[in-house]
């Protein structure tokens, strides 16, 4: 399935049903009073967070959503039914903004969370509402109100516990495929991963956490170079970052410093998140490899997703940090 993380849609509440102008007409009641029913309220439009959805792809094909109109009132004081609401499912982690000014409307993060985005119009009042001592036979009924209309922007920010960060070919996709059921494309060239991937990592017998693999960062990602800026937002919500650097990197310390710079430039508190440095591909580490140390005292783990070296220790470390972050 194609991954789409932004969309713009038009939503409109249903118009209210018209009130009815009617008079009681029965045998032996030649001058019955007004008996027009009220119109029904128009349907509302809601967004609902759905944990089964992982992309905004559907909104590339359908961009207009309108709730049902309220039913008109009838004679004999029969009120019209309310219009049916329209409920639009969106992935958990969807940010909703007003397209006109970019203002934040809501951030839907919890399964089943609902947001009213367009109210239906009020039902019009039937002519009995307009009767008075001086006007006992009003020949007027109120039309239904117009439903609210709004253009909204949807932006998906993935929900994960651990975010994998690294330059292209650092081994992120291989790691997530080795510890979860996720099967991202893997190859020995840069930018194999073109979209984010989520994997559920089983820990011990009854626990698990969610890991997110995003396309590799390059120098200047925070300024929009490469794929970095587009996808760095998907690790904003993560509790812990795992920074991956390949053991055969020419300069591990310099690569780590570069990754930190990009996270700092992007902002959103990425650099303040707890992180673990993973030296990957230890199965092909050079003979003169030495364990690096970093000035920020970030814990360093040596792993190989191919041989399984260090994977259990990695799971222990990540689980401990995820739990400590709540």
Curated annotation (Swiss-Prot):
InterPro entries: G_OBG, GTP-bd, GTP-bd_Obg/CgtA, GTP1-OBG_CS, GTP1_OBG_dom, GTP1_OBG_dom_sf, OBG_GTPase, P-loop_NTPase. Its EC number is 3.6.5.-. Gene3D superfamilies: GTP1/OBG domain, P-loop containing nucleotide triphosphate hydrolases. An essential GTPase which binds GTP, GDP and possibly (p)ppGpp with moderate affinity, with high nucleotide exchange rates and a fairly low GTP hydrolysis rate. Plays a role in control of the cell cycle, stress response, ribosome biogenesis and in those bacteria that undergo differentiation, in morphogenesis control. The lineage of its organism: Bacteria, Pseudomonadati, Chlorobiota, Chlorobiia, Chlorobiales. Pfam families: GTP1_OBG, MMR_HSR1. Residues 119-138 are annotated as: Disordered. One of its GO terms (molecular function) is GTPase activity. Monomer. Residues 1-159 form the Obg domain. Belongs to the TRAFAC class OBG-HflX-like GTPase superfamily. OBG GTPase family. This is GTPase Obg. GO terms for biological process: ribosome biogenesis. It is an enzyme of class 3 (hydrolase).
